Amino acid sequence: MLNRNFDLDIKSNYSLEKSNTFGLDIASESFFIVKNLKDLKNILSENKTKKITVLGGGSNILFTKFLDGLCLKIGLKGIDIIEEDKNNVVIKVMAGENWHDFVLWCVNKGFGGIENLSLIPGLVGAAPIQNIGAYGVELKDVFISCNTVNIKDQTEKEFDQKNCLFGYRTSRFKTIDKNIYIITSIKIRLTKEKHKYNISYGSVKQEIGNMEINLESISEAIIKIRKSKLPDTNILGNCGSFFKNPVINESKYFTLKKKFPSMPGFKIEKNKYKISAAWLIEFLKYKGRSIGNVGVYK
């Protein structure tokens, strides 16, 4: 039996169909929406022997069978400006906020730095776990710190940018501290003036065309590009784009480039080149290919 505090609204045998972007009707033994830190600590403390599954936007998970234990849906809400001067603003965002909605909030306020991360699915709390990034921008570029709760002993801990050990789509929360902490909020620093626009990707530059380059036009261009590549999860269940662009050494890059001249790629550091996973998928004719009930979108 699940240990429960009767003040907490814990659901039993709860369908996760509307809690994952594949829309799979898999049930969880127990389900609870976390709306404040007190409830989070209480429910963790009372269920130390249970398997805990932390669920955000449900876009990075594939349910295949009945989910044993307790599923915690992060519902912590709130956006607060905690520091501000003429040029910059520091914002604290709770983990349960929708990432894309938060990006649009920032764009509408004239705060720059994450407009390239428009329409990335999921919640704010998941953003540091894999250091989300797109079109030349990563979360670490604006990240200050995140607050966490330890699943085992319910202690709170803050990790600054350096201690998050960010890498290409990774962090300590995905490696050495996987399943140890629940991220409850993040702090980021954005610009109010003298924004540094990034339209280095050809598709973004092409989509903007002759429009004025600003926060709105970049965000709108990226939203349009993303929508053209991926189906609406309400129409066709999917997990979005999760492929990492392969990083290879210089020798390998030029060998492949000579053999496949159309292969896109660019230098990221000494002796390291990044090539396009999207190009590889299409070149190898996996775009639109299905095997059984699993497929790559056309």
Positions of the model-derived regions?
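Phosphate/pyrophosphate- and phosphate-bearing ligand-binding catalytic cores of soluble enzymes
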Residues: 11-12, 17-21, 156-298
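Anion-binding (especially nucleotide phosphate/pyrophosphate-binding) glycine-rich loop
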Residues: 1-152
